[in-house]
Amino acid sequence: DDISVPERLERQSEFMEDNPQIGVCGTWIQLIGKYNGIAELETEDDLIKIKLLTNQNLAHPSVMIRKQILENYKLSYSISYTVAQDYDLWVKMFDHCSFANLPEPLLKYRVHEKQNSRKVVEQNSAEGNKVLTNLLIKMGLQLNDSDLIIHNKIFSGIGINSVTIDKTLSYLIRLRSSNIRKK
């Protein structure tokens, strides 16, 4: 029950026509229902892609995808995922095109109770971790058993303690090096 504003498709189509390097174009969203407000998502390619390391920065219901990118690279949603299909697709598209979000709320996104049920959150976390692992490997990072735990602690705001500070620093240095090599 999301609601597109009448001019959404026109604005996104025009933007993609003017920017042929953009393969994925989303928009800011207006939250309605349980929460209200504007989700001001990153608008620039580099920042959107960096945010893929921490969470998604594309509102899937607002996204327009360039069909040619999907066809050229034989990309599609994976049936392996039930709640992280979009995140997985963004990771697959990561190397093949640029991403953008239009800086205006062109979709009204309803937030409801069932989205935050324990089962959905756990499933989202498990599937999200699998996709995140694929992204980190794609970036050239050699993962060890504690890396994903450290990554999630850092980027979820849980934080780290003095016992894990050396491992955390080592992980962040390796992550930065992988990112520099990948560029």
Map each language-model feature to its residues.
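Generic alpha-helical structural signal
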Residues: 10, 126-130, 173
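Membrane-interface aromatic/basic loop that binds lipid-linked glycans or pyrophosphate carriers
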Residues: 1, 133-139, 154-183
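Conserved donor NDP-sugar-binding/catalytic core segment of glycosyltransferases
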Residues: 7-39
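Conserved nucleotide-sugar donor-binding catalytic segment
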Residues: 27, 41-147, 155
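Short, intrinsically disordered, charge-balanced linker/junction segments flanking boundaries
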Residues: 1, 14, 18-21, 69-70, ...
